[in-house]
Amino acid sequence: MGGAQANLRRTMSMARRPFHEEPISRVAIWSSRLGWFAFAVAVLSIIIVRSGLLEIVPALATFAAALIFAGLAILLAFAAFVVIWRQGLGGLGRALLGLFLGLSLLAYPAYLGTRAMRLPAISDITTDTANPPRFEVLARLRPRGRTDYPGPAVAALQRAAYPDVVPLELDVPTKVAYDAALALVTKRKWNIVDTRPPTLGRRDGVIEAVARTPIMGFRDDVAIRVNPAGQGTRIDMRSASRFGTHDLGANASRIRSLLEDIDDAISSTPEPRSLPEKKALPAKKDQPEKRQPAKR
């Protein structure tokens, strides 16, 4: 009996022993921490740029710091994998989290880097390199020295990289084309700073607006010129970045997209149909007037 009680006490004491958690790799912990920190800094830098709280250069420096932290998170994640494998430590989930956050932040900048290597370092694109639309009202908003078109060297680079950026010619009156362009600019929620519709005294129509890039919200300036050409209309467009020497193809894409939408809008508008002419009814022959009997 006494032996049975002793065995029971030993069993209960073993059951009450504290459970020791598996030690976690500190490298994995720091990988996930740096990943989250990089993510927070990247989001903060985007908010700063879009809201205009800081100038472009400090905001971009903040975003670059986020990318550096993301790269460190990836390196620590791979180091954690080695430590976990060799020492049998825990923390695989945290290492994977740090790797995922780091790769997520670096994926889009890496894609932009490949575009920067393929495309020329230009940031002022127009459909008319000989006589580009002018920035008039926008000239007050652009940095000094970035108002005039760069010249023939940039035009040659543009023609080689974006041969499809050409004027849009339409078989419609100038006012119709201008209204279609203005409607699409408004639909895109660009900040319109000047509109000059074509009138009897001024044949050309002009639209000046500010567009923003989707993620960072950089401001790019847009000028649209609508003028008569023969029996129809010609639309020229210019899109230029305010900062930087490389737009990564953003301005050419903006021009291409808007002109295609204008063309589609004009093509889908039904032409007014003229009403069929009414045939003249044959004249009635004169008939002898019937005399009504006199009322009594």
Predicted regions: what is each one?
Residues 20-23, 77, 118, 161:
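Preference for short coil/turn "hinge" residues that link or interrupt alpha-helices
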Residues 2-43:
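Membrane-anchoring hydrophobic segments
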